[in-house]
């Protein structure tokens, strides 16, 4: 049962790290080695503590990457304009190859609202 939980946690963490573009191959290899080791199948306090530290560390990296990305998006929304209409117009002006149907004012407003909410502004 412990192995199944560890496999699921490892898969979730690896997926999160890949989507956050903050993945280092060595970290994933270390997690996999830890998963495969005999210590995981019968963890004692030291191994459980080590696992907890690795998971917390990985989670903090993902959280930091998401917050950093939201900060960039929030800043971009502020630079582009205060209203979704202004932001949409500026994006379409900057990227003439983009079709108007690709960028809806509602979408721009939602993206900016989410970025501001995550970033805390």
Curated annotation (Swiss-Prot):
Organism of provenance: Echinus esculentus (Sea urchin)
Source superkingdom: Eukaryota
Range of residues in the leader sequence: 1-20
Propeptide stretch(es), residue numbers: 21-50, 83-106
Alphabetic keyword roster: Amidation, Antibiotic, Antimicrobial, Bromination, Cytolysis, Disulfide bond, Fungicide, Hemolysis, Pyrrolidone carboxylic acid, Signal
Subunit: Heterodimer of a light and a heavy chain, probably disulfide-linked.
Disulfide bond annotation, renumbered to this chain: 77-112
GO BP annotation list: defense response to bacterium; defense response to fungus; killing of cells of another organism
Residues with 6'-bromotryptophan modification: 51, 59
Protein's name according to its UniProt entry: Centrocin 2
Chain positions with Pyrrolidone carboxylic acid modification: 107
Residue positions, PTM Histidine amide: 119
